[in-house]
Structure formats: structure tokens, C-alpha cells
């Protein structure tokens, strides 16, 4: 096993048994690839911006004498980088410029070109995606969530007997395009077939067929088989196809050639049919009555008068047959129908259809679509054509066409993106077949019928909407304007395009404020799949079926991770290995199985393809050659699990964690947890707040590293090399010679993020985890971010836990926590709050930011500088002034005394009021940063200039430092060059003293190479100078602020929050609770060695919840920590390195058939010591989902670490020193502090705002509300008979308006008298009753 530089420092012992066939894919691929597809040029014009442009352009004028043609587009560069956009509150975007051609023709008909004008036109800004799959919109980081919507195509469904009272099942079909009108086909209770367009009123399906230019005869011909009758004098001869008789009762003896095959009244069976077929009977004699009631298949005309005798679709009667016979017809064609599998639905539908020909059918459709408008033939034809046959209005899309053809069993997956008449006929035929009992309806929740619409596709659709708006305007301008003088630029208005794109990214339901609590919550948010949003479902209308786990979710969508509450099942998470295919369907990887041997070839299958195969599970036992050991293997086939012979198997799962999402795959022993609790565990990990000191989980699953690296919160080496410079804010790496590409430089600089506020007010801070002169390789972690430890995800802390009751303090999931945890700052978190103060231009004059504030004491101004802005580093608490600001006040009437004073002392500052920015109540912290934004043209104050000076100084220092490093890098490259070419020289420094450009070699070829080397450096120097110039310009220029805003001051407060009673904590198994008490260390239960536990949990919280994973984690944690303690003692006692190495190797070797053998032989002594030091706090262990440590292995590890195999130890009571009655389960569990802190929830109300109608106090902290004294609380007081307390609660403390004012007055005056009156809610009740027409009047009873 080859370890990266970071992994060598602390190797995680892996208990996985199965080999890892496929590496975990890049976890943000779904977002990044989709947006790449949107932005990158696609020469075929199938995707992205290119597709949008090609679908709208060329735009022709109404008269056809001019057209605007699209040539190509290019995206410019963003003015500001990501960080600058976040601080300035702007959107990270690039300008889109398009080359258009205006072609003017001489005359409309001949298309002779008169003039061509080409121009590059600006078409608005396109938001860009950052490297981590997010967008910066107006300074905030947002994520566009992928949508799971119904795939375009045709779907066959039934109402399952719910529509009609008889319980009859009514079948329907629906053609859903990507954009355009929906077409529904449906049966009613009488078995007539109808269509609906866009869910309007229904019409018989034959109206649509007639509008497509089919006559009655043609319609019958398409949908029915025929029966020919030959007319004789006394009877009829019927053409016989024996199969058609199956299941019928013979109405007469069926005889032929003197043989009676079937007697009258007998049911015709398969045996009878076989006899008829064997004797090759093709015609039988039938009585005359048999034809009466049959339906004619075509028109029959009188041969002389040419009048119709029988029209198509007419029921035959005796009279009609006589007329036909008289006219000399010898045969008649009828429709073959029966009640079993050839229903007469179309024939019946034709009878209720009032239209006669194409025109009347078109007019009927027009009336249905546009009720109330007088129809004309042209308008009707136009409307019908635009519904399904116009490229502008209808698009089935390539996905839709593929699904359509698959559903109708057409072999090709390509075809027109419009409908044609044969498509409509095929759908009608299939629906009739389903009604006849052939074929099944589709399963709408099957993932083959739902597809993913990702960011790129949604942005493209929005962009197209913007272009359509522009198209209308361009058409008008082409028709109205003077074409000789007009240019493409004059016709295109970029506003509608920008507005459409901006609206989507800013306010679409799927563009969401990124959940940035920790790296996991970021990754999960980007991999989320929502069924809600435009074109999707709504919460209210979604039933149980849509929300439920479907067999096709296997390996595509996680069955565990989904929110609790109204969105359950509608918002899902992508499975670890899932990806989308070219059509947008989810696919998952499988290993190919050939003749019972499992190969390492991997195929990705979508839900549509998967149904055909038999797939073995990942935990099936294989021998070393990949053969199945057992003859019968548990497999999945068509959504069901059963046993199959090993030779029948086609595929095998890739990994045991294939079915779960990233969040669920981080839960160790997930296989031992109940699904409901696992759901809570997966969801609560996303709410964990990054702790001050991160600590890796002792018991992990091996996914931690992938999450930490892919989330983008760590700094990862782009190229290998040596760490040349390092401080808290940047790392510089000298790249390996072989990794330097020609035009590039051999230096990589990584700027670290320091104390930045996240969307959830948590702190983002990166710290280096490499040392000077370390050798790193590409992909190594250089710096840890929030919630990561040595490149592994670390959301919480490993706590020593005991499962036992303790004086009632862990009743109902409460937790008892030791004071030691608080002292060691284990769960201390830093929260950064941003407070902003705006100075505006008002009608009375502009507001001013100043330290000269009226009626404020000197002490309040102590922390402000002369500009009125707080110092960095100041410790502030609730009510302190952060930014002094005064606002002009309206002129007030002055008293004579004031007038006199003003006349003597000049302008007094009484015409301004204090509107300073103060720290909100209940908040205290340290000021860590101040940002000042000044409008262009407004003079900057002293503090702003100071900040500007510091920023410029910092920028110069950075650039010059980088330049120096490049110079030294150049030196090395020159030295390397001279050595390589065997050129002798005295000393390099002497050589470099002169002008190095003047060095000339004898070999001309060397001269060229050397010159190129020097030029490369000079180009770089120039680039750097330019970079510095741009940076200084950005710093010094004014800011683009909202209208009327002169200045914005942002103050950042860092708030340190220790853990306290009321904070919510949780494990990873859904075991959540609230801290009930912080207990002194001396009172906590302790073991024989005097080591106290950190937390005490209630054992009753485990059995009923069935999350046994936490117990196994606790046991394994005890063993891992025990091994750490042994290593710690060995280091303390200065044991020989080879002994330490041997012990660590033995620890790694424990377990049964482990896939990942750890070889410490090639580790140097220095590396062993580093590893041992990192293992002191416990040996980290990975137990992958569904492939984790077994009970035997846990016992083995407990024994090895010197702990009892039961995992239970004797504890002593900290208060009395007595031994507890029985051994207690003690071990280490990974606990998380969730972002539900008591500080944010607690508040107190004195008096405040009231609801307008009921006059009752509002609720909630944001409204400064009160606690509702509800129905049950009233019952409690009634039960105690506390009548006066109850009266007080329901009157003066709530909505008795007069009573509460009097009460306030009385309290101020010092008397506590209460005069309850009429509660306002009673008056509301009276008014509601009056609104029903019942008058209630209150009378005073004397």
C-alpha cells in the first residue's frame, strides 16, 4: 500500500474485507461537469450556450428582407476574483460577447445579398462557478440544487380504479415534451377514448386523428382486424382464423365437410382450435343471424346511383344486408371485435364524434383551445400546427425521443424532436393494447422515468428564455428600422437576458443559500437532488409513492439521507458512486461477471438497463480467482431479491457502500442501526459546528479523507515538490523539475483562508499541516480547514463515555458532561458575526460616520477611533457602540432660551440624532476586522485611508516576496542548465552579478534555450508588475454601492462559545440530547486508575431506538484508545524504536482477512516516531459501511489493548467513592456539538409588540415575543384551582389592552393592583359570530 505524505503521519487501520475495485469518484462532479458543459463551446450545438444560440438564431424579419445570424461567442474574464466578490457583495461573473452578422437582402424572393455587417455584441453577464461548485451571487455563496423531474417521453398509467364509483380501472397515456403542450389520452367509464391538450376539456381521440387527415375508413383500417363474410342464398361463409374463436361460446354447430367440430352452446377451447387448425379449415358456414349487429369496415355504395348503402362503422341490420345483396355485392368486410382482447373502443368513439372531416375537426380543436373566439379555417390550421409540429413551440428533446421510442418498442433511439401522425397512432395503439390486457402500465416512480436536471441545463433554459424575449424585439426592429444605418449592436438589448439569468441564480427555488456549517454539509448540499421546484412537484400534492424508497434507488439515490418533516422523500442525496449519463438518468457502476468469474471491468448501468440483468451483492463471497464460492447467490433482478445459480449472474456490486450517500457512509456500524435513527444521524452530522481544536474520529469509515479533500476546505498540492516557505497565511512549494510544464513556473503559492465568516456564521480558518522542507506529492493535503484534522474530516471530539443513569441528570436523553470538557475547550467553537452600518443620503442631508455623537458619555466612545469606528481587537459586549453615526433631524420648534443659546454659541449639534451601530443585546466578542466601502466621488475618512494603505503594503509585500522566490528559482534553473550542458564556471553569484542577458555560449542552440529561460522570467516579472498595478487600482478605486448609500462600514465580531447546559449534542447514530448539567470533575464516575469519564449517557436511550451501532463504536473506541495509551507509555519510557515499530505493526495486523495490509518495513525511524506520536491519543480505525469490524475482531482488539473483552469496567461514584453495583459500559464515542446553541435560542420579554387583530403578544425570538400560555397550560392551572393566577395569565399578561396599560402604570407607581377587563380575543370571537349573522350583545347584570 502506497501512502501519501499526509497519510503516512497517521494511518487508519482498515477493517474492510472486500478489495476496493473502484476509487471513490470526485464528489462534486455532478455540479462541475454540468456547468462545464453549459459554458464550454460545443461544436455540434447540442449543449450549453451554443445550443441556446442555435435554437433562436438566425432571426428573420417579418418580411424576410433581413436576418440576424449568430457566428460565435466568447466569455470574458471576471473583474474581481471570488474573495473580492464576497467582500464587495458583487456577483462572480464573466461578460458574454457574441459575434453576430446582419445580412440584408436586395429583395425578399431571390435572396440576393445586398449587405453584410458583422459586430461583437455584449449580451450580459453569466455567473461563473467557483472551483468548489458554488456561485457567488451578490456576495453570498449559493448552490444550485439538481432537480429530479419526470423525463420527457410517453407514459402509460391507470387511475387504479379510484376515479369511477364502479371501481373500473381507467387507463391513460400522456406525451410529455421537454417544452410544449402536453397531450393526454384517456378512457372513460363507457370505454370511449378521449384526448386532452394541456389538461383542457376532452375531445374524442378520433377528432385528433381526423385533424391529422385520416378518414373514418382509414381510422378503422389502422386499428381493427377484419372479418370477411361471403353472401350465399341461405347462409353466409365466414373467413376463419381459428385463434379468434378462443373463449367464445358457439352460437350454432360448427360443422365442415360433414364433421361437427363444436356443438352449439359449448365453450370453445384450445383443443377445438387445434383440431380446426390441423384440418386446415379456413372457412365455415354461419347462419344469417350471426352477422346482424356486426360493424361494417368500409363504405358500400349503390353501383347505379352511387348513393351509400352502408357507411363505414355502421351496425348491420337485416334491411341493410338485403339492400347490399340486391345491389349485387357478394361479400362484406366487418370489424373483428370481442369482449376479451379486441375491444371496439375506436369504433364506439367514432360514433360519439360529431366532426366529419379535417376542417371540422380542426375547428373543434380550436374551439377547445380558444373558447369564445370565432374560428376561421386558417387560424385553426395554424393553431393545430403550432401545437405539436412547430420547432419553436414544441420540443420532445433527444431524451424524450429516446424514451418515446423505447416505450413503443421502436429500435432506433434517434428521430425528430417533433411529433408526427404515426407517433400519435402508435401511442393510441399501445394504449388500446393495454386496455385489451396486453402489456403493463409504467411505474412513474421508476428512476428510468425520472431524470436529473443539473445546473448547466437549468441555466441554459433560463438563458434561452432571455433570448426569446430579445428575439421578439429584434424582429420588430428588423421590420421597422432603417436597415442601411442599423448595426447588430443597436438591435440587441442585453437587459432581458441578464434579468432572466439573474432571476434564476438569485431567486429560483433551486438556487439556495449554501449550507456551510462544515465541509460535509457543503458537499451534501451540492449532491442534493430535489423533486421540488419549477416543473417539479409541490409538497402538498406529493403522495406517499413519490416519497417512498424505490428498488431502482439502489446505488443511485440514498435510501437513508432525506429530511424529516414535510419534505421527506422529496429531497434526496446522490449515492457515493452514482453519476448521470448523457440523457440525465442516474447510473451506478457494476463489475462484469463472465461465466461465474467476477472481473474488474466496470460498467455503469442506468435504471432502464439494470432491469434486464441479474446482479449479485457486494458482500458475496469470492475465492482468490474471483469465482463465486457458493453455488447459489443472493441477487437482485427486476427490483426483487432472490437466490440465483452462480452461472446466471451478469454483474456484481462494486462496493458495500454503493447504496448510501456520503453523509450516511460516514456512520460507522451503520449496518447495526435502525433506518430512522441512521437518517437522523446522517442529517445531524451536517449540523455539527467546527470545534476550536479539531480531533479526528477514532472510529471512522475510511470516507473521511475523501470528503475533506473533495469539499475544497483543505489546501491540496497541485504539483509535487518541496515546502520552501511557510507561515500561517501562505505556503510556497518549489515544484519538482519533471512536473514543470514548458511555459509555466516552478513555484506554487497557496494563500490560506484566515478567520473568514461562513454562511452559518461559523469560522473558516486554514492551518498548515506540513513543515519546512517537507517533500510533498501531488494531491497531498498541505493545510487543514475547518473540521478537518490531517486531511481527514473531523466534525466533533472523541469523548470517554459511560452508559449509566446518574442522579436523574440523564433523564429523557439529557447528557451529563464533565467540567474537564469545558476547561480543555473540547467543544469551544468560534462564531463570526458581521454587523454593517450604512451612511445614506437623506432628504434633510447626508448621514455622517463620526465619533462626535450627541448625548453619549466619554466611556462609551473609548473603543472608537477619531473616525468613529471601533478598533480591531476591542472586546465589546451588548449595547457598545461599534460605529458612531449621526442622522440629520427635522427642524424642531425652538424655545426662546435655545434660540438665545444658539445665537451666542453658533450651530449646536442638536439637529442630529444618534443612529450608531451597536452590538445587539446578548452578544459579546472581539472585533477581528473592519471593512469600509466608500462611494466613488465621496472623500475617504482617515480610517479608510489607513486600511487602504495597509492593503497596498500587504499586496506589495506579497508580490515582491513571490518575485524573490522566482528569482531564486531562476538561479536554480540556470545552475541546472549549466550543469546539464557541462559548462564550467567559477561561482554562480559572480556570474549573476553582471547583466545575465549578455551571457553568450559557443553553441548557438544553447544560446536559444538560455534566452528562452531568461525571457520566461522577464515575462513573469512583467506579469507580476501588471498584477500589482491592477491590485492597487482595485484597492484605491471607489466602490459601486446601492443608490443613496455613501459609505458602508462592516465590523466582524468573533464570539467564542463554550459548551453549556442547554446546548444540543449528538453522536453519529441519531442519539441526540441536550446537556443537563456541567458536573465538577471530582463528582464524575471514575475507574480503578482514577480516570473520570467525560460524559454520562442514559442506557435506556439505546434498546428502544435500536441504534446498536453506538455501543459497538464505544467498545471499539475503548480498544483504539487503549492501544494509543500503550504507545504513549512506550514513548514516555523511551522504549527502543524497533519495539515501538513491532507493537504498532502487530496492532495493524489484527483482524480477519483485512484488505489493507499496513507495511511499516519501509518507514524510516523518523517516520515511525512521527506516526507513534500521532497515535498517542488512540489508533484511528476505519470500519466501512456493511463491511465493518465483526464482534470477534472487536473482542480481539479489546484484549490486545489490555481491556476486558466485555467492554465493561468497574466504576466508582465520584461523590461517595463507593463502587457501583455492576460493571458499566465505558468507551470512546465521537460526539458532535450541533448548531442549536442555547445562546441563540434564549431570550426574555418585558413588554413588546402585539398582534394587530388579537392584541396578543407575538411569538419567537426574532419578534421579541413571549411564550404562549396554551390550552394545556390553562388546564394545569385549572387543575390546581389557581383561579387568580389563571385570570392574570388570560387578561393583563395577554390581551386585555386597558388592563395591561393600567397594570404597567401601577407597577411603576409601586402598587401591585390588577384590574382585569375584557380580553380582546373575546371581542374577536363576538365579531366572528356576528359575521355569521348571529348578534350577541353583552348586558351588565345589576
Swiss-Prot record:
DNA-dependent RNA polymerase catalyzes the transcription of DNA into RNA using the four ribonucleoside triphosphates as substrates. This is DNA-directed RNA polymerase subunit beta. It catalyses: RNA(n) + a ribonucleoside 5'-triphosphate = RNA(n+1) + diphosphate. The RNAP catalytic core consists of 2 alpha, 1 beta, 1 beta' and 1 omega subunit. When a sigma factor is associated with the core the holoenzyme is formed, which can initiate transcription. Its EC number is 2.7.7.6. InterPro entries: DNA-dir_RNA_pol_bsu_ext_1_sf, DNA-dir_RNA_pol_bsu_external_1, DNA-dir_RNA_pol_su2, DNA-dir_RNAP_su2_dom, DNA-dir_RNAP_su2_hyb_sf, RNA_pol_bsu_bac, RNA_pol_bsu_CS, RNA_pol_bsu_protrusion. It is an enzyme of class 2 (transferase). SUPFAM superfamilies: beta and beta-prime subunits of DNA dependent RNA-polymerase. Belongs to the RNA polymerase beta chain family. GO terms for biological process: DNA-templated transcription. It comes from Wigglesworthia glossinidia brevipalpis. GO terms for cellular component: DNA-directed RNA polymerase complex. Keywords: DNA-directed RNA polymerase, Nucleotidyltransferase, Transcription, Transferase. One of its GO terms (molecular function) is DNA binding. The keyword Iron-sulfur does not apply.
Amino acid at each position: 500500500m502506497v501512502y501519501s505524505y499526509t497519510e503516512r503521519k497517521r494511518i487508519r487501520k482498515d477493517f474492510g474485507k472486500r478489495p476496493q475495485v473502484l476509487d471513490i469518484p470526485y464528489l462534486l462532479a455532478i455540479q462541475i461537469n454540468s456547468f462545464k458543459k453549459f459554458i464550454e463551446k460545443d461544436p455540434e450545438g447540442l449543449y450549453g450556450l451554443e445550443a441556446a444560440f442555435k435554437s433562436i438564431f438566425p432571426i428573420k424579419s417579418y418580411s424576410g428582407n433581413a436576418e440576424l445570424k449568430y457566428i460565435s461567442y466568447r466569455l470574458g474574464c471576471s473583474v474581481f476574483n471570488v474573495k473580492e466578490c464576497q467582500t464587495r457583495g458583487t456577483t462572480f461573473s464573466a461578460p458574454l460577447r457574441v459575434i453576430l452578422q446582419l445580412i440584408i437582402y436586395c429583395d425578399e424572393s431571390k435572396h440576393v445579398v445586398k449587405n453584410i455587417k458583422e459586430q461583437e455584441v455584449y449580451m450580459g453577464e453569466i455567473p461563473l462557478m467557483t472551483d468548489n461548485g458554488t456561485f457567488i451571487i451578490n456576495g453570498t455563496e449559493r448552490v444550485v440544487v439538481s432537480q429530479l423531474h419526470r423525463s420527457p417521453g410517453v407514459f402509460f398509467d391507470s387511475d387504479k380504479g379510484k376515479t369511477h364509483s364502479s371501481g373500473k380501472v381507467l387507463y391513460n397515456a400522456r406525451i410529455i415534451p421537454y417544452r410544449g403542450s402536453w397531450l393526454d389520452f384517456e378512457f372513460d367509464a363507457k370505454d370511449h377514448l378521449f384526448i386532452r391538450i394541456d389538461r383542457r376539456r376532452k375531445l374524442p381521440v378520433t377528432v385528433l386523428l381526423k385533424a391529422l387527415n385520416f378518414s373514418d375508413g382509414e381510422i378503422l383500417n389502422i386499428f381493427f382486424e377484419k372479418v370477411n363474410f361471403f353472401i350465399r342464398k341461405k347462409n353466409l361463409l365466414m373467413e376463419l382464423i381459428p385463434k379468434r374463436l378462443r373463449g367464445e361460446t358457439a352460437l350454432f354447430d360448427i360443422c365442415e365437410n360433414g364433421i361437427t367440430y363444436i356443438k352449439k352452446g359449448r365453450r370453445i377451447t384450445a383443443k377445438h382450435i387445434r383440431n380446426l387448425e390441423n384440418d386446415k379449415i379456413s372457412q365455415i358456414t354461419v347462419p344469417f343471424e350471426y352477422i346482424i349487429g356486426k360493424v361494417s369496415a368500409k363504405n358500400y355504395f349503390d353501383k347505379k346511383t352511387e348513393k351509400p348503402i352502408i357507411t363505414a362503422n355502421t351496425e348491420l341490420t337485416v334491411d341493410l344486408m338485403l339492400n347490399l345483396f340486391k345491389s349485387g355485392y357478394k361479400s362484406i368486410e366487418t370489424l373483428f371485435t370481442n369482449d376479451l382482447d379486441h375491444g371496439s373502443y375506436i369504433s364506439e368513439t367514432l360514433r360519439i364524434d360529431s366532426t366529419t372531416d379535417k376542417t371540422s375537426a380542426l375547428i373543434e380543436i380550436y374551439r377547445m383551445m380558444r373558447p369564445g373566439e370565432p374560428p376561421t379555417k386558417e387560424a385553426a390550421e395554424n393553431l393545430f400546427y403550432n401545437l405539436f409540429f412547430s420547432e419553436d413551440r414544441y420540443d420532445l428533446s433527444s431524451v424524450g425521443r429516446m424514451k418515446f421510442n423505447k416505450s413503443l418498442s421502436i429500435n432506433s433511439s434517434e428521430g425528430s424532436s417533433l411529433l408526427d401522425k404515426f407517433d400519435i397512432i402508435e401511442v393510441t395503439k399501445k394504449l388500446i393494447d393495454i386496455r385489451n390486457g396486453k402489456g403493463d402500465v409504467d411505474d412513474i416512480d421508476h428512476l428510468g422515468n425520472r431524470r436529473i436536471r443539473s445546473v448547466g441545463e437549468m441555466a441554459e433554459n433560463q438563458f434561452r428564455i432571455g433570448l426569446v424575449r430579445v428575439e421578439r424585439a429584434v424582429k420588430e426592429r428588423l421590420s421597422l428600422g432603417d436597415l442601411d444605418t442599423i448595426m447588430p449592436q443597436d438591435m440587441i438589448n442585453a437587459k432581458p437576458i441578464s434579468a432572466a439569468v439573474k432571476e434564476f441564480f438569485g431567486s429560483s427555488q433551486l438556487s439556495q443559500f449554501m449550507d456551510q456549517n462544515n465541509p460535509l454539509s457543503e458537499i451534501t448540499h451540492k449532491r442534493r437532488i430535489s423533486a421540488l421546484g419549477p416543473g417539479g412537484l409541490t409538497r402538498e400534492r406529493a403522495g406517499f409513492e413519490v416519497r417512498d424508497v424505490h428498488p431502482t434507488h439502489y446505488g443511485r439515490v440514498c435510501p437513508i439521507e432525506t429530511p424529516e418533516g414535510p419534505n421527506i422523500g422529496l429531497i434526496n442525496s446522490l449515492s457515493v458512486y452514482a453519476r448521470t449519463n448523457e440523457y440525465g438518468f442516474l447510473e451506478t457502476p457494476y463489475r462484469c461477471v463472465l461465466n461465474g468469474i467476477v472481473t474488474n471491468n466496470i460498467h455503469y448501468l442506468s435504471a432502464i438497463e439494470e432491469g434486464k440483468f441479474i446482479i449479485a451483492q457486494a458482500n458475496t463471497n469470492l475465492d482468490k480467482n474471483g469465482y463465486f464460492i457458493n453455488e447459489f447467490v443472493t441477487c437482485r433482478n427486476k427490483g426483487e431479491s432472490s437466490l440465483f445459480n452462480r452461472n446466471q449472474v451478469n454483474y456484481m456490486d462494486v462496493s458495500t457502500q454503493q447504496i448510501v450517500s456520503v453523509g450516511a457512509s460516514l456512520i460507522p456500524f451503520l449496518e447495526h442501526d435502525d433506518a430512522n435513527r441512521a437518517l437522523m444521524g446522517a442529517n445531524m452530522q451536517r449540523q455539527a459546528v467546527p470545534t476550536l481544536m479539531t480531533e479526528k474520529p477514532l472510529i471512522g469509515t475510511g470516507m473521511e479523507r475523501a470528503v475533506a479533500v473533495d469539499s475544497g476546505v483543505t489546501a491540496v498540492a497541485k504539483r509535487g515538490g518541496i515546502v520552501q516557505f511557510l507561515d500561517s497565511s501562505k505556503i510556497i512549494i518549489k515544484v519538482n523539475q519533471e512536473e514543470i510544464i514548458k511555459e509555466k513556473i516552478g513555484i506554487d503559492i497557496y494563500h490560506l483562508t484566515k478567520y473568514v465568516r461562513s454562511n452559518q456564521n461559523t469560522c473558516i480558518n486554514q492551518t498548515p499541516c506540513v513543515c519546512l522542507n517537507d517533500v510533498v506529492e501531488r494531491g497531498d493535503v498541505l493545510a487543514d480547514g475547518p473540521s478537518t484534522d490531517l486531511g481527514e474530516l473531523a466534525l466533533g471530539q472523541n469523548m470517554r463515555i459511560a452508559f449509566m443513569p446518574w442522579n436523574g441528570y440523564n433523564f429523557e436523553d439529557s447528557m451529563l458532561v464533565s467540567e474537564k470538557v469545558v476547561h480543555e475547550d473540547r467543544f469551544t467553537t468560534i462564531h463570526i458575526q458581521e454587523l454593517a452600518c450604512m451612511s445614506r443620503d437623506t432628504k434633510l442631508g447626508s448621514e455622517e460616520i463620526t465619533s462626535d455623537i450627541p448625548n453619549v458619555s466619554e466611556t462609551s466612545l473609548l473603543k472608537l477611533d477619531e473616525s468613529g469606528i471601533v478598533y480591531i481587537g476591542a472586546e465589546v459586549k451588548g449595547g457598545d457602540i461599534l460605529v458612531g453615526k449621526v442622522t440629520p433631524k427635522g427642524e424642531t420648534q425652538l424655545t426662546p432660551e435655545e434660540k438665545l443659546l444658539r445665537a451666542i454659541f453658533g450651530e449646536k449639534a442638536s439637529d442630529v440624532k444618534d443612529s450608531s451601530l451597536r452590538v445587539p443585546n446578548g452578544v459579546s466578542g472581539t472585533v477581528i476586522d473592519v471593512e469600509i466601502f466608500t462611494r466613488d466621488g465621496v472623500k475617504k475618512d482617515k480610517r479608510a485611508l489607513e486600511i487602504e494603505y495597509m492593503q497596498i503594503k500587504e499586496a506589495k509585500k506579497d508580490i515582491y516576496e513571490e518575485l524573490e522566490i522566482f528569482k531564486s528559482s531562476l538561479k536554480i534553473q540556470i545552475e541546472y542548465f549549466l550543469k546539464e550542458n557541462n559548462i564550467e564556471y567559477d561561482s554562480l553569484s559572480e556570474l549573476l552579478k553582471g547583466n545575465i542577458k549578455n551571457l553568450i555560449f559557443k553553441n548557438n542552440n544553447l544560446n536559444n534555450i538560455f534566452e528562452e529561460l531568461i525571457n520566461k522570467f522577464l515575462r513573469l516579472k512583467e506579469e507580476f508588475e501588471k498584477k500589482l498595478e491592477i491590485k492597487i487600482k482595485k484597492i484605491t478605486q471607489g466602490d459601486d454601492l446601492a443608490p443613496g448609500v455613501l459609505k458602508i462600514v462592516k465590523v466582524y465580531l468573533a464570539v467564542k462559545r463554550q459548551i453549556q447546559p442547554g446546548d444540543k449534542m449528538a453522536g453519529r447514530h441519531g442519539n441526540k440530547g441536550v446537556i443537563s448539567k456541567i458536573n465538577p470533575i471530582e463528582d464524575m464516575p471514575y475507574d480503578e486508575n482514577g480516570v473520570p469519564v467525560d460524559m454520562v449517557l442514559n442506557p435506556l436511550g439505546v434498546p428502544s431506538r435500536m441504534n446498536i451501532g453506538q455501543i459497538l463504536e464505544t467498545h471499539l473506541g475503548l480498544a483504539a484508545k487503549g492501544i494509543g495509551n500503550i504507545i504513549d507509555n512506550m514513548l514516555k519510557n523511551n522504549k527502543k524504536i524497533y519495539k515501538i515499530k513491532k507493537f504498532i505493526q502487530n496492532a495493524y495486523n489484527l483482524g480477519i482477512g483485512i484488505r489493507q495490509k499496513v507495511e511499516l518495513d519501509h518507514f524510516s525511524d523518523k517516520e515511525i516516531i512521527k506516526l507513534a506520536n500521532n497515535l498517542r491519543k488512540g489508533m484511528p480505525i476505519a470500519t466501512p459501511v456493511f463491511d465493518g469490524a465483526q464482534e470477534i475482531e472487536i473482542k480481539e482488539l479489546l484484549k490486545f489493548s489490555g481491556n476486558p473483552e466485555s467492554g465493561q469496567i468497574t466504576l466508582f461514584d465520584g461523590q461517595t467513592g463507593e463502587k457501583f453495583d455492576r460493571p458499566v459500559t465505558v468507551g470512546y464515542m465521537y460526539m458532535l456539538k450541533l448548531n442549536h446553541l442555547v445562546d441563540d435560542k434564549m431570550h426574555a420579554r418585558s413588554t413588546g409588540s402585539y398582534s394587530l387583530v388579537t392584541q396578543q403578544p407575538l411569538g419567537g425570538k426574532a419578534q421579541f415575543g413571549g411564550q404562549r400560555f396554551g390550552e394545556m397550560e390553562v388546564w394545569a392551572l385549572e387543575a390546581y384551582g389557581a383561579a387568580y393566577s389563571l385570570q392574570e395569565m388570560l387578561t393583563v399578561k395577554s390581551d386585555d389592552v386597558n388592563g395591561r396599560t393600567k397594570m404597567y402604570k401601577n407597577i411603576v407607581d409601586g402598587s401591585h393592583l390588577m384590574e382585569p377587563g375584557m380580553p380582546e380575543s373575546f371581542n374577536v370571537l363576538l365579531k366572528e359570530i356576528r359575521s355569521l349573522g348571529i348578534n350577541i350583545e353583552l348586558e351588565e347584570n345589576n
